[in-house]
């Protein structure tokens, strides 16, 4: 199992729950839709991603012993092909093509439009490879780890902290 904490700010608060999670301790919680207390032990990874190193107020070293810090320098940049401006105007590489795309879609017979919407990759094979690349690039953890592997491949109890320094 994996717990992901993204866009983590510099934090020096209480780390008791985090220590319980990565230490294999019993954690007490309340079950949803029931007035019952429950205890569980978590055995998995905790991934904390942020622009600064994780600051800890605890002095026992319990978290530090379980933490693997690695720099994540392979940023996946968002590409916007169509940007909505004020007053309903659009900017970007596709802005000039909107009217032609709309004409093409509206002039198409209903049956053809339905088939294309149902399985677009058959009617446009290049979409298959493009969709695969998009899925890989949208998974920021996957994109980052493809070039910056974590030093441990065994998902035992631990923290993997990705540090993405601001340039």
UniProtKB/Swiss-Prot annotation:
Keywords of the record: Mitochondrion
Record-linked InterPro entries: P-loop_NTPase
Subcellular location(s) of the protein: Mitochondrion
One Gene Ontology cellular component: mitochondrion
UniProt main location, coarse: mitochondrion
Protein name: Uncharacterized mitochondrial protein ymf20
Organism: Marchantia polymorpha
């Amino acid at each position: 199992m994996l717990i992901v904490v993204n866009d983590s700010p510099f934090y020096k608060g209480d780390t008791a729950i985090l220590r319980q999670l990565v230490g294999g301790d019993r954690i007490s919680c309340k079950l949803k839709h029931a007035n019952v207390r429950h205890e569980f032990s978590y055995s998995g990874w905790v991934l904390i991603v942020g622009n600064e190193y994780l600051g800890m107020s605890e002095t026992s070293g319990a978290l530090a012993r379980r933490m693997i810090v690695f720099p994540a320098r392979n940023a996946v940049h968002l590409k916007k092909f169509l940007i909505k401006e004020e007053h309903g105007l659009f900017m970007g590489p596709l802005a000039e093509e909107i009217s032609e795309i709309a004409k093409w879609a509206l002039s198409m017979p209903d049956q053809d439009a339905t088939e294309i919407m149902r399985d677009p990759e058959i009617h446009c094979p290049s979409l298959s490879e493009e969709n695969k690349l998009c899925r890989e690039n949208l998974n920021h953890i996957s994109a980052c780890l493809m070039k910056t592997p974590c030093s441990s491949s065994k998902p035992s109890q631990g923290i993997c902290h990705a540090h993405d320094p601001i340039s």
